[in-house]
Each structure stands twice: as structure tokens, then as C-alpha cells.
From Swiss-Prot:
Family, as annotated: Belongs to the class-II aminoacyl-tRNA synthetase family.
Pfam family, one: tRNA_synt_2f
Principal location listed in the UniProt entry: cytoplasm
GO terms under biological process: glycyl-tRNA aminoacylation
Protein name: Glycine--tRNA ligase beta subunit
Compartments, as annotated in UniProt: Cytoplasm
Subunit structure and binding partners: Tetramer of two alpha and two beta subunits.
Protein's gene: glyS
Originating organism: Helicobacter pylori (strain P12)
Length: 701
């Protein structure tokens, strides 16, 4: 037998769920890297976890290391030997090389060739060694390499970790790993484990991976998080069927309850129906954030949408036959939480949105208060309302009044007691408060939707009205934060401006709104007039970089369109998609190289051209038939009115044949300078015309 199964358990105090989940996916990769570092070839690597243990299971862990050769290259023989003759023996330089390696016998030294020079050489062979001596150093290096964000020290230990470590149990090939002092973390190892807390506090001896798994299974520890998740989902499904309810499975919450339980049990509790007078988001958020409960819904018929039910799902880690006692305890805690929520909500309803003291809250240092931000957004909203008035289906005067009102009260809920308790309800609470205070429904809904989209695939504002309110918020945040240097760099983006920018582009694209990233940004910056001066091209470039996330496409096609003067967001997307359709068309697939060869040559001829240079040309200076043929084909395109971008692109790429003939027969760099200049100007005109769609030299096929 050359290998065996290796199991390592790190027993810890309860790990914080979110930190554990964030780092868990990296653990197998980090472990694999440590094995590679030591040239250990292993089988599959699995990492399991519960709140109080990490378990590393490695199949086919070798019993012995591989035999390795370590090579050392010294100085050139010419300068390391006496009289430049290696037969005369080594001089001080040569002797020094071997002495550094701890070698005394230099009589039969070796040489080798490196970089075409003969140099002193020595090879050290490392024989196979038992791998058992490497296991603990690997485990300790693994622990030190984990990144949980925060760590702590306890007692007089040398190293820190996210929570105190109580034991490292190593099970491998019957070897003895007991009583190894781990001074870094302040304990001696035991080949033992602990089970579920309710099963006992003592260590239980184990002597093999098989015995380890059996002990945990018999004592209410489900080691594999996938199995714990499956158990939770199965028990939820059974409760749904039994009680005719619908449980909303929040995936983040599901992962969290898997991470905080060793033996999960799913229980159904209920709360007083009187609490259902609260907005449903308050109840579901309170249950999730404070108690880690799943929300329950009921549905009277298939035609009706599910409504919040006065029930909740709790995932318990307790081992108890008295389930009702556990449920009763959770119901009592939830009642207190929801009673607090009622108090906050009713207090908020007493305060008019108009009276929110926005001037008392600083937006960002150097950018004024929330009131200042609201006033800047109002100016932006007025500009956008006038620009998009035809899409609002209401008189301009009415639109200006309602959107102005929406922006004025949009930030009021940030000062509410409910949002102070649950920040994720910002905007949502503004919607409910606005309805209760008899605001226009469009105004109220725009408050709810002002922060949308919340993520890449999340819903967008449901109307152009809401879109204008959302765009005003996003544009002001970009202008103001860029103006004080809060620009994302590398992985740092504390104000989530990349997500915000993506949302801005997605809203504009979804509603087909005209927005020029050069002209409109400049107009808005000047109209608001109070931002600190900064180079708007930096913001323009930042927004252009987001197109790679916005469009699922070959990046070079996106780059080709962005390399033109086109800065209208919708037109950029239309051109990219049209080029993609053309290049994806099966009829063009086989001739892409042919299509692009002439256009690439056209681009190369013009690559150093000054765009401001005069580009006039005269047909009278054309000498070759191919010049006239290309001009006629090009002129036919220039004077045509195309039904679509697709037909225009088709026509432009149709120039490849006359272009090929042109380059075969016409010498652009003619000896006659006037003819040469005329030809270059003509080709520049053809190239410039294609820039109406994209920069062909950027497209990679």
C-alpha cells in the first residue's frame, strides 16, 4: 500500500456563519496548493464543516514523499579553478561554493553547462521520507492561510484565529498523532472528537476516518453541509404539504442556517395575526435578520398571488422530543421583535415626510448633507424630465411637479425608526409612508424603486417615471463622489459605484432613453453647477468600461464601437448587437477572414492618421479602374437610406470585394505625391465612414 486516507479535524468554538461561508469555497484550493508546494500527489480533497469543526478529508494521501533532486550551479570553471585549468583544482572562489553547501570533498567536483558556460555543479538527492511528519506543519500552515476577515487571540497563544481552537485530530494509516504540542494555539493534540453539545462535552476517542464518521453519525452531527441542507429542504417540503403553505426559500438564509447547525430540525411556528397589519417587508426582514426564520405564505387559488401568512419556519439545532417547547420559545422572541416593529412603524407614521430633517445627516464628508444631495438630484431630475417628457404620458408641467415631489421626499425614510433598524428597507418604507400620507401612487412607487436594480439580474424600475428618480440618484452619486476623488480602484469600491453605474446603463438601455455620455454628462454637470471640478472624461471612461458587463458579446466588438465617437448609450448597444448578429450569421462564419483582411489593411493604412487632417480627394486624380469601382460602390452606400443597422452593416462589409481588388491593383504610395495624397485621403474617407458603426481594426475574429 502506497497511500491511505487522511482525515484532519480542527475543533473550534462556534464559527461565525458569514465568515465561514465566505472562506469555505477557497479551502480545498488552499489545501491543494500546500500539497503541490511539497510535491505531494494526492487524490480528491474534501472539506466539511459544522459550526464547531472543520474536517479535511484527503483520499490517496501518499505514505512517502517522492525522491527529488536539488541542483546547485556555481561560478564558471574559468574563474573557479587554479590557472584556469580545472585539472589543477579549485581556488578560493570554487572552494567557497562547495563550503556553502556543507561539502568537504572537492577532489572529484562536477561541472555542467548553463547559459553556454561551464560552471561548477552539485546535485543533492533527497530520499523518500515518511509523509506523516509533514501533516501537522501543513495543517498549521493551512490554518494560518485562512482569511476570515477578523481574528482573535486567547490565553497566551502565539497565533490568532477567528475563534479559539481546542484540538487538531489527525487520523492517517494508524499513526500516533496524540500529545503533539501545538504551542501556536495552546493545546496538545488528541486523536479524539466531540459530538453535538447536547450529547456530551467529553472527547470520544477515534482511531480511523471510518470510526470518526460513525461516532459523529451516532451522536447527531451531520458533517456534510450538503446533507444538512438536503435535510432542511426535505422537512420544509413536508411541512408545506401538511399545512398547505408556501415557504419562501431565501438562499442566503438557507446557507446561513446550514452553517449554524450540526443536526438541523425544521419547525413551524406562528405569530399573532394582528401583526399582519405591518408591511410584509418589515415582518420578513425582522424574521430573517434578527431570528433567521423563513417567511411563510398562503395562496387561496392559483389565480391569486401568495400572501404573507402568520407562520414562520425555524431551523433548530436542538435535540429534543419536546418540539412545542422550542417553538414556544421562538414564538415568544418573535412576538417581542414584532411588537418593537409596530412601535417603530407607528411612530414613523406620525412624522410627515416633508418634515424629515435631511439637513442633519451628512451624505459624505465634503459633499454636504442629505438635503444638499436631494437638491442636486432635483436639478438632475428636472433636466431628465424635460428630456424624456414624451415617454411619460402626461403633460410636462404635471410630470415636473410629480417627479419634483418624489425627489424631494425620496430620502425622508432614511431618518425613520424602521430604516434605522433595518437599513435594507430604505425606499420600501418610503413607499408605505407615502401611501399612508396620501401621496400620488407614481410618486410613492418611485420611492420604492429609486435604488433599483439591486444586483445584476434584479428587477428594474417599473416605469420611466420611476426610472428618472432612480437615474437622478445615481447620476448625482457619480458626479459628487468622483468630484471628491472617491473613484473605485482595483477591488476597492466602498460606495458600490460599479454596481450603481451598471444599474444606470441598464435602466437607460431597458427604456431606450437617449443619453449621450459626453454631451449629457457635460450638460448635467454644468446645470447642477456646484460639483467640485474634475475631468469628466474619467467618469465617461468609467461608464464605458461597464459595457462589457452589460452586453454578452465578444469584447472586441464592444471595443470597436466604443472606439468611435458614438457615446449615446442605446445606439452603442444597438451597434454592438448588430455587429454581433452579422458576425454570428452562419453565412458569414466561413468567410470572416476574407471579409476582414481588406478592412484590416484599410485600418492599418490609416492608423497614424491625424483625425483633424484635411481629407478631401478628387475623382479626376483616379488613374485605375479599381479606384473608380471602389468609389462607385462606396458612394452608393453613402447615398443610400438603410432600413436598419443590419442592412447598413451588410452593405459596408460588401465593400470587401472592391477593396481587395483595389489593394491588388492600386499602389497607394504612388511616386507622384499628389496622387499618393489623393489615394490616402480617399481611403481615409472610406475608413471614417465605417466608423459610423465601429472601428474595424479592433474586432478580433
Amino acid at each position: 500500500m502506497h497511500s491511505d486516507e487522511l482525515l484532519v479535524e480542527i475543533l473550534v468554538e462556534e464559527l461565525p456563519a458569514q465568515a465561514l461561508l465566505n472562506e469555505y469555497k477557497e479551502m480545498p484550493k488552499k489545501l491543494h496548493a500546500l500539497f503541490q508546494k511539497r510535491a505531494l500527489e494526492v487524490g480528491t480533497i474534501e472539506v466539511f464543516y459544522t459550526p464547531r469543526r472543520l474536517c479535511l478529508l484527503i483520499k490517496d494521501f501518499p505514505l512517502l514523499t517522492q525522491e527529488t533532486k536539488e541542483e546547485f550551479f556555481g561560478p564558471p570553471v574559468k574563474i573557479a579553478c587554479n590557472h584556469q585549468d580545472k585539472m589543477q583544482g579549485l581556488n578560493a572562489l570554487g572552494l567557497g561554493f562547495y563550503q556553502k553547501l556543507g561539502l568537504k570533498d572537492h577532489q572529484h567536483f562536477q561541472t555542467a553547462f548553463k547559459n553556454n558556460k561551464e560552471v561548477l555543479y552539485h546535485a543533492k538527492i533527497h530520499a523518500k521520507e515518511p509523509t506523516k511528519d509533514l501533516i501537522m506543519p501543513i495543517v498549521l500552515e493551512f490554518l494560518e492561510g485562512l482569511n476570515f476577515g477578523k481574528s482573535m487571540r486567547w490565553g497566551n497563544v502565539e497565533k490568532s484565529f477567528i475563534r479559539p481552537i481546542h484540538n487538531i485530530c489527525v487520523l492517517f494509516n494508524g499513526e500516533n498523532f496524540n500529545n503533539i504540542e501545538v504551542k501556536e494555539y495552546g493545546f496538545k493534540t488528541k486523536q479524539a472528537t466531540k459530538t453535538h453539545r447536547q450529547e456530551g462535552f467529553d472527547f470520544i476517542q477515534v482511531d480511523s476516518p471510518k470510526a470518526y464518521f460513525e461516532v459523529l453519525e451516532k451522536n447527531h452531527v451531520i458533517l456534510d453541509p450538503k446533507k444538512r441542507k438536503a435535510k432542511i429542504l426535505q422537512e420544509i417540503k413536508e411541512l408545506e404539504t401538511k399545512h398547505h403553505i408556501i415557504v419562501e426559500i431565501d438562499r442566503d438564509l438557507l446557507d446561513e442556517v446550514v452553517a449554524i447547525t450540526e443536526y438541523p430540525s425544521v419547525l413551524l411556528g406562528e405569530f399573532d395575526k394582528a401583526f399582519l397589519k405591518l408591511p410584509s417587508e418589515i415582518i420578513t426582514t425582522s424574521m430573517k435578520e434578527n431570528q433567521r426564520y423563513f417567511a411563510v405564505f398562503s395562496q387561496k387559488s392559483q389565480e391569486e398571488s401568495p400572501t404573507l401568512h402568520n407562520g414562520f419556519i425555524v431551523v433548530s439545532n436542538a435535540i429534543s422530543k419536546d418540539k412545542q417547547k422550542i417553538i414556544a420559545g421562538n414564538q415568544k422572541v418573535l412576538k417581542a421583535r414584532l411588537s418593537d416593529a409596530v412601535f417603530f412603524y407607528e411612530n414613523d407614521l406620525k412624522k410627515p415626510l416633508d418634515n424629515a430633517p435631511l439637513e442633519s445627516v451628512v451624505f459624505v464628508q465634503g459633499l454636504g448633507t442629505l438635503k444638499d444631495k436631494m437638491e442636486r438630484e432635483s436639478t438632475i431630475a428636472q433636466y431628465l424630465t424635460q428630456k424624456y417628457a414624451p415617454s411619460l404620458n402626461m403633460p410636462l408641467e404635471k410630470a415636473l411637479e410629480l417627479i419634483g415631489r418624489a425627489v424631494k421626499i425620496a430620502k425622508a425614510d432614511l431618518l425613520s425608526e424602521v430604516v434605522y433598524e433595518f437599513s435594507e428597507l430604505q425606499g420600501i418604507m418610503g413607499y408605505y409612508y407615502a401611501l399612508k400620507q396620501n401621496e400620488n401612487e407614481l410618486v410613492a412607487l418611485s420611492l420604492k424603486e429609486q435604488y433599483l436594480p439591486a444586483s445584476e439580474n434584479a428587477p428594474l424600475p417599473s416605469s420611466v417615471f420611476s426610472a428618472i428618480v432612480a437615474l437622478s440618484l445615481k447620476l448625482d452619486s457619480l458626479f459628487s463622489l468622483f468630484s471628491v476623488g472617491k473613484i473605485p480602484s482595483g477591488s476597492k469600491d466602498p460606495f458600490a459605484l460599479r454596481r450603481l453605474s451598471f444599474g444606470l446603463l441598464k435602466i437607460i438601455a431597458h427604456y431606450g432613453l437617449e443619453f449621450d455620455l459626453k454631451a449629457d454628462l457635460k450638460n448635467l454637470f454644468e446645470k447642477v453647477g456646484i460639483y467640485q471640478s474634475f475631468d469628466l472624461e474619467i467618469l465617461e471612461k468609467f461608464l464605458l468600461e461597464r459595457f462589457n458587463n452589460l452586453i454578452d458579446c465578444n469584447p472586441s466588438i464592444i471595443r470597436s464601437v466604443l472606439n468611435t465617437n458614438e457615446r449615446d448609450i442605446v445606439k452603442i448597444i444597438q451597434k454592438v448587437k448588430a455587429l454581433k448578429r452579422f458576425l454570428d450569421d452562419p453565412k458569414n462564419a466561413q468567410k470572416k477572414e476574407l471579409l476582414f483582411s481588406a478592412f484590416k489593411r484599410l485600418a492599418n493604412i490609416n492608423k497614424d492618421r491625424n483625425p483633424n487632417e484635411s481629407s478631401g480627394f478628387s475623382i479626376s486624380l483616379f488613374k485605375e479602374l479599381q479606384e473608380h469601382a471602389l468609389f462607385e460602390a462606396f458612394n452608393a452606400i453613402k447615398t443610400s437610406a438603410f432600413e436598419s443597422l443590419d442592412s447598413k452593416i451588410e452593405a459596408y462589409f460588401g465593400l470587401h470585394a472592391p477593396l481587395e481588388e483595389y489593394f491588388k491593383s492600386v499602389l497607394v504610395m504612388d511616386k507622384d505625391i499628389e496622387i499618393q495624397k489623393n489615394r490616402k485621403n480617399f481611403l481615409w474617407g472610406v475608413y471614417q465612414s465605417f466608423l459610423e458603426i465601429g472601428d474595424i481594426k479592433e474586432i478580433a475574429i
